[in-house]
């Protein structure tokens, strides 16, 4: 079946085990704030989706289906252990395969993105798409608007999915203290690299740590004969981003 059947763009659907090129917007010369502001002025719904992607690293489908009131829940409703509490409120995201993850609303950017989205929708149970259209049409409209502003591989070398890459790369940098391999960062201690990659995978909604390689690039740590893969996982097909 085609990517469109699953509500995914080609870039989201294709398998990439290890990123060899930085697909983030900033790495390709895109002024992120300027583009998002322009899109918000043109179409507040698509602009709100972009703000959600930038704040939480969502897939475009997740951003369109996000319900800015119903999807915000107190920590007590997440089922996470008390020691994992990072915020009073969390965004409940239903990802691919029905997997649910909870993203802490622990920064001004995340809180502002949700507040903006709440100001756009017309009801407490609304999502970020046009309620008169089905998901496929809403996703096509999202793509149309981004194409209008030059967010294509042909024009700027990036896609909407590249904004998700931007967020996940930045998340790794914040935890590891350096850029990931795909952005030419320095080598870091194996355990620190593993912890940062695990956190990236969790934020992205992937079950396996190996999936982080699709955004960050290959692990660059010293390996010894007979050791397991540097990410500590057995060989397996990469997950779709």
Q: How should these model regions be labeled?
A:
Residues 1-35, 94-96:
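Flexible interdomain linker/hinge and immediately adjacent N-terminus
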Residues 106-177:
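Active-site/catalytic core of tyrosine-dependent DNA strand-transfer enzymes
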Residues 202, 208-216, 220-241:
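Catalytic-site neighborhood detector that most strongly recognizes the C-terminal catalytic loop/helix
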Residues 154-213, 228:
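Short basic/aromatic active-site micro-motif
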Residues 65-113:
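Conserved tyrosine-mediated DNA breakage-rejoining catalytic core shared by Y-recombinases
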Residues 29-60, 201, 212:
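Basic, Lys/Arg- and aromatic-enriched nucleic-acid-binding interface segment
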Residues 45-46, 58-59, 101, 117, ...:
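Short, cationic motifs built from Arg/Lys/His that form the positively charged side of catalytic pockets
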Residues 61-66, 218:
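Alpha-helix N-cap/helix-start motif at helix boundaries, enriched for small hydrophobics
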